[in-house]
Amino acid sequence: MKRREFGALAAGALAMGLPFRAFADETCQSPYMPKITGQEEFVYVWTLGVEGMGDEQDKLVTIDLRPGSATRGQVINSVSVGGRNEAHHGGFSADRRFFWTGGLDTNRIFIFDVHSDPSNPKLHKTIDTFVKDSGGVVGPHTFFALPGSMMITGLSNDDDHGGRTALVEYNDDGEYVATYWMPTADDMQGAVAVGDAVADGYGYDIRALIRKNVMLTSSFTGWSNYMMDFGQMLQDAEAMKRFGNTIVQWDLHTRQPKKVFNVPGAPLEIRFPWGSNANYAFSTTALTSQLWLIYEDDAGEWQAKAVADIGNPADIPLPVDISIAADDQTLWINSFMDGKTRLFDISDPHKPFQIYEKVIDRQVNMVSQSWDGKRVYFSSSLLANWDKKGKDDAQYLKAYNWDGKELVEDFAVDFYELGLGRAHIMRFGSSALYSS
């Protein structure tokens, strides 16, 4: 099946309300792609190179997850890309054959072939023209698969390196399609500011609810902040003003912004549930440590409200990655500063509450769970200049088993001990995806 044919098939199945879960994986992927519902076989870790360590380069690291394998829990392959680019996030194409990753500093995009040999990905293509293509967007962050194309969120721009940014779309062949700038107070592009919201033009994550034609984007900070030393930034009053405070609702099909919501404190990851009647999404705010609900009200209008605190906001635990369970009943929330993961009961999305917590290590960032929720994986790095220093700079991938009551460690991979670097985003692979 050709890639464009796959995209059309996926879109058609979803439009008819059919489940497109031939296989399935981590529950926070684009709904357009197949999922790994069974046992994930590999985890790909996009890793930041460290000066003086190993080859010093950013790399895609593959860890074996196959039950019974002699190398289970071990690194079995690594692909270096040349230099340090501030490796950060990545996402699969809609056919799941290619894994797109980005560098927040150099603005390079690396596309890996993960289908030819899922145990041994290969660098397929590098895009060096992101800033030029997009008309000045900097910091390719989230890679969200659409049928036949990849939507990429920017974090910054090449004018003032602040937070003003855009969405950038490429086709599956890596050819530039279009740029969609975030609305600002000076240029709302037809969007409406809800309540006291002020459109700041910032970007970070992107997710979509296809059957409602709704796309949401969140907001973080620009290059001048995310490349600054974390301690230095905290002492810089002007820098601390340069964080996003908005979530934007878009028309998925026309790519036009519709509403701007006031969500103070840098809302980061966005996650929609999977239920056919679940018309809402969650996000967390990094600086104010709150869980937010973006939801459709009884009148069919989308709204946003804070629904829970995460830890003690006064301690600034710094919520980072989140992962929603496939049954829409629970939500894992990691917080970087205290190294904790917390599990929230979200069975009533308007009244979530914490039911469990565990310290993973001295710092923790990303979380991914299997489709059945029985296996949960954690990785460590936030940003090269924001990670902790000295003995607190733990860099790892850790795998846990979850029985509904307790996380029990299965195995851990020390990325510093192996000379790999800083472990960031994780994505699962399986040869079963490509067997037919």
Curated annotation (Swiss-Prot):
Pfam families: SBP56. The keyword Repeat does not apply. This is Methanethiol oxidase. The keyword Signal applies. GO terms for molecular function: methanethiol oxidase activity; selenium binding. It catalyses: methanethiol + O2 + H2O = hydrogen sulfide + formaldehyde + H2O2 + H(+). Catalyzes the oxidation of methanethiol. InterPro entries: Quino_amine_DH_bsu, Se-bd. Residues 1-24 form the signal peptide. Its EC number is 1.8.3.4. It is found in: Periplasm. Coiled coil: none annotated. GO terms for cellular component: periplasmic space. Belongs to the selenium-binding protein family. It comes from Ruegeria pomeroyi (strain ATCC 700808 / DSM 15171 / DSS-3) (Silicibacter pomeroyi). Induction: Induced by methanethiol, dimethylsulfoniopropionate (DMSP) and methylmercaptopropionic acid (MMPA). It is an enzyme of class 1 (oxidoreductase). Pathway: Organosulfur degradation. Keywords: Oxidoreductase, Periplasm, Plasmid, Signal.
